[in-house]
Amino acid sequence: MFEARLVQGSILKKVLEALKDLIDEACWDITSSGISLQSMDSSHVSLVQLTLRSDGFDTYRCDRNQSIGVKMSSMSKILKCAASDDIITLRAEDNADTVTMVFESPNQEKVSDYEMKLMDLDVEQLGIPEQEYSCVIKMPSGEFARICRDLSQIGDAVVISCAKDGVKFSASGELGTGNVKLSQTSNVDKEEEAVTIEMNEPVQLTFALRYLNFFTKATPLSPTVILSMSADIPLVVEYKIADMEHVKYYLAPKIEDEEAS
């Protein structure tokens, strides 16, 4: 038997919004330590890794480890039926072919329950190696979303250049070019408004904006985003989820030959 109750049910709604446009179906791995998910997007270009720790839920019970195959669009449709202040409970019997979602209003006067059919998925887990990165940029998540959205008007790809003093986002296309430079902030009252850069060596890499715009759908989950970059390995875009862990997106840089084609 598995049961997890989340008083701040809106977190789960935001998690699904952050994932559903990128991945259509995924295995949710449920263990005593929490819920995790790892999946390539449908075009096998990017990778998503989600961790929700058990101690971040208000109550959590998992009698035995299980993996449940979920169609993300179906789960998203059901979670849309929950109000943003509802308490959400997920429940599944061992080896069940459905999962139950219960939505309770804060005053307990309205309780809805939905049963969703599970899928039989056979997904191979990819090992994600621990990496040291040349540049780690921490910045407001809303700012990153806006830069990606704005530069999408100019071109299909963004060049991210990281140096000690700041980070530059550049795009070019038929109508011209666009550049956004963010300097490292020295003194900010609110930590989430700061731009901080930890740099071992400068990095300049090119990424497809289409995917970055999918990643920024996680913006409501966290006030800050962390970008980790090194030459020739995937960019990591990480959103911390309060008290629960994170969602991380991995995207390989575009290679010069691709840009020319």
From Swiss-Prot:
Residues annotated to bind DNA: 61-80
Domain of life of the organism encoding this protein: Eukaryota
Pfam families, per the entry: PCNA_C, PCNA_N
Keywords of the record: DNA replication, DNA-binding, Isopeptide bond, Nucleus, Ubl conjugation
Gene3D superfamilies membership: 3.70.10.10
Major subcellular site: nucleus
One Gene Ontology molecular-function label: DNA polymerase processivity factor activity
Keyword Ion transport appears in the UniProt entry: no
Compartment annotation: Nucleus
Key word Isomerase present: no
Gene Ontology CC terms, in alphabetical order: PCNA complex; PCNA-p21 complex
Any GO BP annotation: regulation of DNA replication
Description of post-translational modifications: Monoubiquitinated by the ube2b-rad18 complex on Lys-164. Monoubiquitination at Lys-164 also takes place in undamaged proliferating cells, and is mediated by the dcx(dtl) complex, leading to enhance PCNA-dependent translesion DNA synthesis.
Protein name (Swiss-Prot/TrEMBL): Proliferating cell nuclear antigen
Species in which this protein is naturally found: Xenopus laevis
